[in-house]
């Protein structure tokens, strides 16, 4: 009797354990992941209140390269962040995404002319060269 009860108990534990595991997997598991978090979470963090969080999100997206292409609209918005320490890694993320970031070309061209921080303006230029070399104005 005890052995039968143990068998039933072990089957229940196995069944419950696997369903708990399945429920704990993120529904967005097909998204690219960086540092254990899905792309959509990093995109959302570009709008976080803390600039350190926005900075970290931009660098994580940069590290994802072309896989972060769905983040381009949010990255374009983030180019207007009031904090230079956020704008800079956003330009890096667009550079790393490459040609899939073509939608950012007009804003990056504008940044080259209007950005008061020379490092960010230069990074915008490098991003443009990577996205589409013909989009970089001749000097």
Language model features with spans:
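Bacterial N-terminal signal peptides that target proteins for export
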Residues: 1-10
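Amphipathic alpha-helical scaffolding segments comprising HEAT/armadillo-like alpha-solenoid repeats
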Residues: 35-44, 66-80, 100-112, 134-139
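Structural detector for internal amphipathic alpha-helices that build alpha-solenoid repeat scaffolds
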Residues: 25-33, 52-67, 77, 85-100, ...
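Short, solvent-exposed beta-strand/turn patches at coil↔beta or beta↔helix junctions
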Residues: 43-51
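Short amphipathic alpha-helical/adjacent loop interface patches that line ligand
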Residues: 5, 61, 72, 94, ...
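Bacterial N-terminal signal peptides
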Residues: 9-19
